Amino acid sequence: MLQYIKNKRVLFITTKNPDYIRNTQEIAFLEEHASFYTVIASTHTSYPKRLLSIYRRLLTVHMNEYDTVFLGFAPQLVLPLFAWKFKNVDIVEDFFISMYDTLCCDRCKFRPDSYIGKLLHKIDRLTLSRADAVFCDTHAHAQYFAQEFQADPDKLFTMYLHADTTIYHPMSVNRPAGLEGKCIVLYFGSILPLQGIDIVLDTFRLLDHYANLYFICIGPIQDEKLTNPRPMSDCIQYINWLPQEELARYIAMADLCLAGHFHGSIGKARRTIPLNAYICQAMKKPMILGDNAANHELFKESDNILFVEMGNSHALANEIIAWWKKHPQ
């Protein structure tokens, strides 16, 4: 894979905002290995406007100035339209997500056997087939892409995510009055289906009678999408959103973090290492992970890294209690 980047002239294209963690990670990789690189990205808050801005720039770029094009987030939105422009350069892709898997199997926007589902599957397959090298976020995802889309296994390479350690690092914070002596259990996330928010909230419900446990949930919960109403209790705090610097302070304050993923039936949840896990690792916080192949690629069971059966709130509740009893406040 490195032969396509090392000492090469690279054009990096991403449809995600430039400061997105995966972009900064890959740009740092280019900084280290490429002879020089150019970034085509956009800061538009509107995704359609961002795409149009990128497309306009691509129409005017001179590809004879580059050896390699590196397609960052969502290469499916670029390669099908501009393959003609990239025919004389090597193509590296970050296949961070499958459109088919995300929209049909994870978020269930379309049926897999529908016209759109089949089209998304074809776009994923063709995008993968045209690459000389493909970055995946886990070995588990690489295996899935090879099996589901017939991607060449020899072209698939794993680049794990990492946390932004300028924000997420060990720190000490003072607890609010009333939380001294309590065990704070924290969940934070963007509340995507694969994360398993219903499992987390059911776990809070099972444990809300423990006076010395305090639960904090940070993320934009949509109540209408929950299987059951969210539990309400004096020992449960909900926060819709926090800037990253403030989120880091809450993580530092927590005793135990629920990293996930916890959904029991979405396949993608078993092939992905949650960003939460990388953040907790960077901040040296105890965490509970979903018991799946992807998480086991990087993490081993220990006193402060626990695995739990996915889709089972009772198992998660028992794991929290067991950890709490070993680490009394």
Predicted feature descriptions by range:
Residues I251-R270:
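Acidic donor-binding loop of glycosyltransferase active sites
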Residues A146, H162-A177, G196, T227:
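Acidic anion/phosphate-binding donor-loop and adjacent secondary structure
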